Amino acid sequence: LETNNKDVEVRLINSALVSLRIDGYKVTNPIGFKGKEVVVQLYTAFAPLVHISAIERVCDELQLDLVAIAVEPFAVCRACLGDDIDSSLSAIVMDIGGGTTDIAVVEDGGVEGTKMFSIGGRSFTHQIAERLGLDFEAAEKLKLLADSPNMKPELRRKFDKAVERNIEVWQSGVELAIEDFESENLPGQIMLCGGGASLSAISETLATGDWYKGLPFARRPIVSLIDPEDVPDMVNDTDRELDHTFITAMGLLRVGIDTLLGTGDDKSIKAKLARLLKN
């Protein structure tokens, strides 16, 4: 475990098949292939039992059934992948929340790993409040209006100065987290979601900065916000317009659906292994 604390009791909360290889060749179904070596790559995520017990107690108090516990970036990836067990999606998925930034690398439809660091939207709000002499609520409103063409030039200058340093620190966190994946070739697409991604300076920094040059990208990555309309196998049947800030919730819904339908009749190798991991 990353904590190096052998006394921490943990439980497996998320698992998924990343890839199957026979003698170095990636295959979807190994049946019928001949070879000497079969390599199965798995994604697993664990949580301390003390945290899980706390969640279970909250559910008991609220008289709710605990369907599943999920790592946020894994849930977001599940939303992006949908029901297609043979998806070829390759991307870096970033969920920029209020307190953390969660990053996942997806390669050919498999979640290769997840990382997290503790800088999110609230960090930017606190910096804006401090630099501009505002309370937290006013700073949050100003942050949400950052892209408004009606912002006065002097206020714009102060706002940009307030978030500049935080952007640099956040970018360094992204670099370190992605470097920690130790991937030889990173996907050329970065997909953003979460409330923190609403700050345009974040996507602009990723899309135009030189931060990627020290990492194994073949070229400058393409950066985009995840559109709920592009999330497969999920339909918004309400009158409410959704945006990238709802993707995390859609991901948790996806994991819940996966859990409830975990005894489905999909007979593919990936599906069988996925069900085996859950048991």
Q: Where are these predicted regions, by residue range?
A:
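A polyampholytic, Gly/Pro-enriched intrinsically disordered region
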Residues: 8, 89-94, 135-142, 237-262
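Nucleotide/phosphate-binding catalytic cleft detector across ATP-hydrolyzing
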Residues: 1-91, 112, 146-153, 157-164, ...
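Active-site proximal loops enriched in glycine and acidic residues that flank catalytic Cys/His/Asp
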Residues: 105-107, 115-116, 178, 194-195, ...
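Glycine-rich phosphate-binding loops at beta-strand->alpha-helix junctions
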Residues: 185-214
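Conserved phosphate-binding/catalytic loops in two-lobed NTP-binding clefts
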Residues: 208-247
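Residue-level signature of catalytic and energy-coupling elements of molecular machines
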Residues: 59, 95, 128, 192, ...
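Acidic, glycine-rich loop-and-beta core segments that form the ion-binding/anion-interacting portion
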Residues: 81-149
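A general structural motif
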Residues: 97, 166-176
